[in-house]
Structure formats: structure tokens, C-alpha cells
Amino acid sequence: MLFNRSLPAPAHPTSITTLNGSNLEYVDNYKYLGVWLDCKLSSQTHIKHLQYKMKSRISFLYRNKASFTHAAKHTLVKLTILPILDFGDVISKIASNTLLNKLDAVYHSAIRFVTKAPYTTHHCDLYTLVGWPSLHTHHQTHWFQVIYKSLLGKAPPYLSYWSP
């Protein structure tokens, strides 16, 4: 994949040959360690995949909602939906508000599943009902925790390499 932030899509390059003589395949999107990269280094592809993954899980939960108690719904969303949002949330630092609003909508849908709140319920009321922060606050808190751990020297090796 060649990265190019210019507006037109990059032309497919001539073949790139490795040291052992094999040709590399050109791809527009590539998943690396759970994060989707595209040739323009935008977060749109990653956010779309997150949105699809969360929607499919929430749909499954809604189809089987009669089988779950309130506590079970709360636990299921906490264990199946929230980790998707947490993994790779550093990408949200560079995402546009339009893309983040799409994740907010899915997050609100997950909260509505837990609380049985109608669609017209304001998002602030949803957060109060379930006792969770907004997605922005959640990501900001996680970001501050990463910075704090880095300062204490308890960051993962790939992050501590970049800290003083």
C-alpha cells in the first residue's frame, strides 16, 4: 500500500519487487493489528468496520433480548460492544466529528438496548440511566490513562520507546 493524502486516488504503481524477487500486491485497505489502514490514511475505513462490527452484535442482542435479564444485558454490552470501542480508540483522535457521530449513534443504540429507553431519549439521559460517560469522555479518559502510564514508565514497550 502506498500512502497518499491527496484527494485523487493514487494510480496503481508498477510492481514493487522485494529483495527475494517476489512482487508485492497493491491493496487499497489493509488490516494491521486490528486497525484498518487505507491508502489516504483516513480513519473512515476503520470507523466503518467498527460500526459494522458493533451493529451486527447489537442486532444479535436485540433479536435475543427476551432471553436476557437487565443485568445480563448490561454485562453483555459491557463485554461485547465496549471493547470494540476501546481497541484502537487512538484512531478517534484523528477522526472527523462526522465519523465519530456514527460511532456515537451505535453506542447510544447499545445503551438503549440495556435501558429499554425509546429512540427519542436524549443522549445525556441515556448516559445517566446506564451510568456510563459519553463516548468522547470515555476516549479522553483512556487517552489520559495512557499518557499517565507512560510518564510513570508503565507503558507498553511500543509506547515507552517514544517517551523520554
Predicted features and spans:
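Short, charged alpha-helical motifs in flexible N/C-terminal segments and linkers
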Residues: 1, 99-164
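Short, conserved micro-motifs composed of acidic
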Residues: 1-28
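Short intrinsically disordered coil segments
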Residues: 15-20, 47-52, 127, 160
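Basic, alpha-helical interaction scaffolds
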Residues: 21-91
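Residues in well-ordered beta-strands of folded domains
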Residues: 1-3, 18, 33-36, 144
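Short, well-ordered loop/turn and helix-capping segments at boundaries between secondary-structure elements
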Residues: 6, 38, 42, 60, ...
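Short conserved micro-motifs at the rims of enzyme active sites and ligand-binding pockets
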Residues: 11-14, 44-47, 155-156
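Charged boundary/loop elements
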Residues: 85-100, 104
